[in-house]
Amino acid sequence: MSDRAEDPAARAAQLREQLEYHAHRYYVLDAPEIPDAEYDRLFTELQALEAAHPGLRTPDSPTQRVIGAVLEGLSAVRHAVPMLSIKTETDTTPTGALKFDAAVRNALKLPPDAPPLRYAAELKFDGLAINLRYQAGRLVQAATRGDGETGEDVTHTVGTIESVPKQLRGITAPVLEVRGEVFMRRDDFEALNERQREAGLKTFVNPRNAAAGIVRQLDASIARQRPLSFFAYGLGDVQGWDVPPTHAGLLDALAALGLPVDAHRTVVEGGEALAAFHAGIAAERDALPFDIDGVVYKVDERALQQQLGFKSREPRWAVAHKYPAQEQSTQLAGIEIQVGRTGKLTPVAKLQPVFVGGTTVSNATLHNRFELRRKGIRIGDTVIVRRAGDVIPEVVGRVPVPRTAYIPNFRMPRACPVCGSQALRERGSVDYRCSGGLFCAAQRKQALLHFAGRRMMDIEGLGDKLVEQLVDGGIIRTLPELYRLGVAKLVALERMGDKSAANLVAALEASKATTLARFLFSLGIRHIGEATAKDLARHFGALDRVMDASVEQLLEVNDVGPVVAQSLRTFFDQPHNREVVEQLRAAGVHWDEHSGEADLTPRPLAGKTFVLTGTLPSLGREAAKELIEAAGGKVAGSVSKKTDYVVAGEEAGSKLEKAQALGVAVIDEAALRALLD
C-alpha cells in the first residue's frame, strides 16, 4: 500500500501546501510553474480526499474558498482604525506633483536648500477598497470601506479571490489588518461580459462596477465564477507586528508575507521625479492590464508621516494625483427633466450611448437652462461628454458644426413633469423647482430614500424599488406613514416575502431610537447637511429650540450663515412641516436631548476623551457619541494614554484589552449615563 493511502492526512496537508504555492505563483507572481491541467488535477485529488475523510477538511483549505449558502444580507463591520480617504490633486497635469511636494516641504518647515524628500509612488487602482483582517496570520474577515467608519462584511466573496491569501507566511501577530484594492483585470472583464451576452444577461459597464457588484454578492458561488484580483497598499489595525519604518519597506514586507503588491511602485526623490512618474504612467496607462484613474504619492518615512499628521481627516503626507477625465463626442437625442428631492428640475441629456471614462454613458447632466444657453446646446447637436470627477457624466459643450435645420432652444417647463404643479424660480436662483412638495411623487420618493439613508434614520432594507412601489401604489404619502407599515401590507408587494417584510418592520422599529442630529439631517431641509445638523444639535440640544429659533439665534451656530438660517426658518414656519415632525414623534421616533451650548452652562465631560467599543445595551454608537460630544467630551477612534474612559459594551474587542493594558478607566453604559447627569 502506498504512503498516500496509508496517511491521507499527510497527503491532504501536502496537497494544500502545493496548491497554495502554485496559486501564489500564478495569481500573485504571474510566473506559473505547472500547467493549468496539473493544478486542476491536484485540486481534484484534494477534493476527493476531503470527501472521503471529512475530518481533513479545514477552513483554510483551497477547496473551501466557495461558500455555497446564500446569505440573508451583508452585516456591518466597524473599522478598528477608520479607512480614511486621501486628498485628490485637482491639477491633473504633472505640475500637480510639484504642488504636493511644495506643500509637504512647507508643512515640515524645510529651508529651500534642504535635500529632496523621498516619496513612495504607486498606482491609484480603479476598484473597491477592502480591509483584510488577519489573526495569527489567518484571514478572519474582509470588509468594504463603507463610510470610512463602518463597512460591510464581505468575507464570503473576498475569500474566493485567489490572490487574497487565506494564510500569511511566517507571521503569528495577533492582529494584522491589510488594506488594498479589489479590481477586475480588463481581459477578465471582457471575458465576463462575453459570457453575459451569450447567456442573454445584462453586461457590466466597467471593471470597477463589476468588481464592486461581485464583492457585494450574497452568493459566494457566483463570485467564484467571476474572477477578481487584489493588490495590497497599506495597513489598518496592527497588534504585535513591527511595522517597517518606510512605506516602501512596508510594501516589500507585505509581499514577503504572500500578499500581492503591484510592481509599478517605486521610490523617488523630489517633486520633479514625482512629475516624471505621473507622466510615465500616463504614457503606458492604456497598456496596463487593469484600469487606474491616477497615481498616489506618499511621504516614504513613517516618522515624517506622523510629524505631518492629518488635516480634515485626510493625511497631509499623501495625495491622489488623477489624470484628466476622458471625453468623447456623441449626439444629443433629447432632453428630459429630472425632479430631485428638493424639487429641483434638472435638464438631463439623452445621448446616443458612448463609451467614455470606462463607462457606457447614455444620460448626462445639463445642470440648468443657463448652462444650456451658455453652451449653445440644442437637441440633435453633436456634443462633448465628459465624466466629471470620473463619476458624474456631463455635457461640456457642442462640436461646432453647422446645423442642417432650425432647432429651437430648449425651454424649461412651467409645470412639474411628474405631478403638474407649478415650476417656480426663486429670485437670485438659476434653478426651477416643483412647488408640489410631498404632493409630488418624485419628491416623495427621493425624500423617503433620504430619510432612510444610513447616515440619517438608517432603515435597512428600504431601497429604490420598494420606495417606488410604496409611492406609486399610494401606500405612503408622508414620512410618518412609514411607521404604520405592517407585515401584511408589505408582503403584498413584489419581491417581499414574510421574512423580508418582518425584517423591514424590525428595521423601522429600530430606527425610532436615533439622535437629534440624524433626525434633523433626515428631514431633507435645503442646505442642511450632516455637519450642520450636528452643529445645530450641539448648540440647541433640543428639537423645539431649533424649530423656534429666530434667524438671529440660528446665526449664532457655528458655520450657519444667512442662507442656511433662512432655509431653516422657512422650513419650520410651514405648518405641514411641523405636523410631519409631530407625527414622527407620536410614532415613537425619539432621541436624548440636553441643555445645549446656547445656555452656556458648564458641560460635565468638557476636556474628556472617550473611546467606544462593543455593543451598548440601549444606546447606539452614534447616539452615545452625540451625547458625549453634547456634554463637551470628545470621542476618539483608538485607545491611547490620553484616553480618559473606554465605554465597553457586549463583545468588546481589542480596544478593551488595550485600555486594560494602559490602565485606562473602563466603564459601562450605566456609568456613562451617570457621568452625563
Curated annotation (Swiss-Prot):
Short name of any one Pfam family annotated for the protein: DNA_ligase_ZBD
Cofactor(s), names only, from the UniProt record: Mg(2+); Mn(2+)
Q: What class of enzyme is it?
A: ligase
Does Magnesium appear among the keywords?
yes
Keyword rRNA processing assigned: no
Q: Indicate the transmembrane segments per the record.
A: none
EC numbers, comma separated: 6.5.1.2
Name this polypeptide is given:
DNA ligase
